[in-house]
Amino acid sequence: MLDKTKQIWFIGIKGTGMASLALILHDLGYKVAGSDIDKYTFTQDPLEAAGIEVASFSKDNIKESGQVIVKGNAFKSDNIEVAACEEKGVKWQSYPDTVEEIVQQYTSIGVAGSHGKTSTTGLLATVLGEAAPTSFLIGDGMGKGVKDSRFFVYEADEYRRHFLAYHPDYQIMTNVDFDHPDYFKDRDDYASAFQTAADQTKKGLFVWGDDERLQKIHPKTAKKYTYGLKDSDDFQAFDVVKTTEGAKFHVRANGEDLGEFTIHLFGDHNVMNATAVIAIAFTEGIDLDVVRKGLVKYTGAKRRFSEKDFGDTVVIDDYAHHPTELRATIQAARQKFPDRKLVTIFQPHTYSRTKEFEEEYVEILKGVDKAFLTPIYGSAREAAGDIKSEDIASQIPGAEVIDFDNLKDLLAYKGDCIVFMGAGDIPKYEVAFEEMLGK
């Protein structure tokens, strides 16, 4: 249990969710510190800015009293601090269980789904924050705790069924599209986790109406609402106009036109994400003009279509690593930069996922003007596999595998839209390329 008289020590504090949670608890008046690998990660910047200690792993960090230990999901007994807890008889609590403590203190809204969680959570937090004090936990390393909050908005990760620790008032489910083949047995096993999460939702479940798996999910207690583009949806987006500045659209609820809304986000998926946010706000009785203000204010999450200009060259960084996410990112780039050639640098993420979706990756990357792939990014669980990036590139006309030794080949595409996509260390390639552009 969280305790303000004790230090809250995070094992793995630089993980995206852990960093967000540490920031929230710090804002709420807890004494927060933690440890992680020494290698730089972008999540440490807000931690350091908040004055939160980030130490190296050491058994000496674990005290026999005076601490509440929060353990990151990735760390097992082979971690020196987890081992120290076991040796000293010090109990720890998991990241999901700690988040659940916060969930129960406020009107809570979880955002689940195979794709779109981070962007939708950020958008929802911004909109609700315009209406009332709102704490939030976002999977891009950002978190904020606001005392006397009315709302708590959080990203609910389905991996290893972590989100089943939560019992929110409301939940958005953006889609159910098979992922994490290293853990889930098959598509039915994956979907069953979302059914359980729906059963644990108390008041309202908001699902994308076009998703076949979500159509089959029926919560035990909460009322189910659909959002989408169809007349049959409870919250229907219509008269959608997409431009190089974003999108404008109307939303209909119970036959009533709620008026026009504007977002400075790109791609069909973001219209759907915004409609889900509008549905939550409408259900909670929030003034729609306040909702409009929040929608316009939000410009995106970290590593979600993050855009930089280098003269006439546009560089975009995106977390996309699942086929559905690649499609959405490519569509968004085409929408915003219709007159530029589209060059993609994709880093496949984990061998099991790459093998599972090989055919889809080939199909998608055939649709860009020039496709590059970096070597596959493995994981602690999968250090090697029986597929490599060359296997994908060989099936795509003109595609190449790129690494740091031939990264300069990208300079031939100055003036184009260059998109780096992946969930591993693809930002290292982007930074190296940007340094070349700056010379």
Swiss-Prot record:
The keyword Nucleotide-binding applies. InterPro entries: Mur-like_cat_sf (IPR036565), Mur_ligase_C (IPR004101), Mur_ligase_C_dom_sf (IPR036615), Mur_ligase_cen (IPR013221), Mur_ligase_N (IPR000713), MurCDEF_pg_biosynth (IPR050061), UDP-N-AcMur_Ala_ligase_MurC (IPR005758). Keywords: ATP-binding, Cell cycle, Cell division, Cell shape, Cell wall biogenesis/degradation, Cytoplasm, Ligase, Nucleotide-binding, Peptidoglycan synthesis. Disulfide bonds: none annotated. Its main location: cytoplasm. GO terms for molecular function: ATP binding; UDP-N-acetylmuramate-L-alanine ligase activity. GO terms for cellular component: cytoplasm. ATP binds at G113, S114, H115, G116, K117, T118, S119. It holds the Pfam family Mur_ligase_M. It is found in: Cytoplasm. Pathway: Cell wall biogenesis; peptidoglycan biosynthesis. It catalyses: UDP-N-acetyl-alpha-D-muramate + L-alanine + ATP = UDP-N-acetyl-alpha-D-muramoyl-L-alanine + ADP + phosphate + H(+). GO terms for biological process: cell division; cell wall organization; peptidoglycan biosynthetic process; regulation of cell shape. Its EC number is 6.3.2.8. It is an enzyme of class 6 (ligase). The keyword Cell division applies. It comes from the Bacteria. Cell wall formation. PANTHER family: UDP-N-ACETYLMURAMATE--L-ALANINE LIGASE (PTHR43445:SF3), UDP-N-ACETYLMURAMATE--L-ALANINE LIGASE-RELATED (PTHR43445). HAMAP family: MurC. Belongs to the MurCDEF family. This is UDP-N-acetylmuramate--L-alanine ligase. It comes from Lactobacillus delbrueckii subsp. bulgaricus (strain ATCC 11842 / DSM 20081 / BCRC 10696 / JCM 1002 / NBRC 13953 / NCIMB 11778 / NCTC 12712 / WDCM 00102 / Lb 14). The gene is murC.
